[in-house]
Amino acid sequence: MRLSTFFISSLAVATSAAPTWPSLQLNDIGDPLGALSAVSQYFNLVADKVSAVKTMRGSPKCDLSKAEMPTVPGLPPPAPGSKLRHVAVGRGTQNYTCDGSADSKPKAVGAVATLFNVTCMAAMYPEVTNKVSNMAVHFDLDAANRVGPATLPVSGHHYFTAAGVPFFDIGDEGQIPCAKNASADAPDTSTIGRTGERAIPWLRLLATKDATKGLGEVFRVSTAGGSPPATCKDRTGPFQVEYSAEYWFWSK
């Protein structure tokens, strides 16, 4: 598979559109300097890659065997023999609820996110991919299904079923209901959320029997924001915390 004209143009559009859309509301962000740094790092890398592509004699190859998933101590690798199928950046909310007691801890009740296709980006330009999640969490959730200023195609959606099962629908690539197999704290250097929330843990999720297209595992890595407050003080009932993350899908 070779790099498509669409992918190159997507990077170029993201760079040219930055001054006008979308706006970055620094007054609403707990760490404005960190937000500006994350966004500027993303655009600088995009500009470098667009310039490099324009001077290449041929197109770089989208070889998924070359992609290297981020790792963190304590999180097991994919099962031996697994093959990478898809990589997406998820942008959405982690959902929690409080029972009315100020001293109790918020209870996790699921998540909702739109998934944006960064598969070839992860294979060819991993340093750019790693900046997308860090950048995206600082921009408003958008009804037009855009991940901040990046013009990335939507590859699917993530949500929890009525039975509380994590579910990923990535279109033609398949559907994967799954269950948590392992968890590891996000690195201390992870991007915080818009109002200072710590990054949610990295996860390994294993498919249940109803998964399709041979999908076997999902990894949540490179997380930004999403963690709840330590207690339910001043909170009652359901609430949401915005987050972004990379999701890596592996087949058996």
Indicate residue ranges for each PLM-predicted region.
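Primary mode marks residue(s) on the alpha4-beta5-alpha5 output face of response regulator receiver
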Residues: 21-94, 102-252
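Fungal secretory targeting signals
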Residues: 1-23
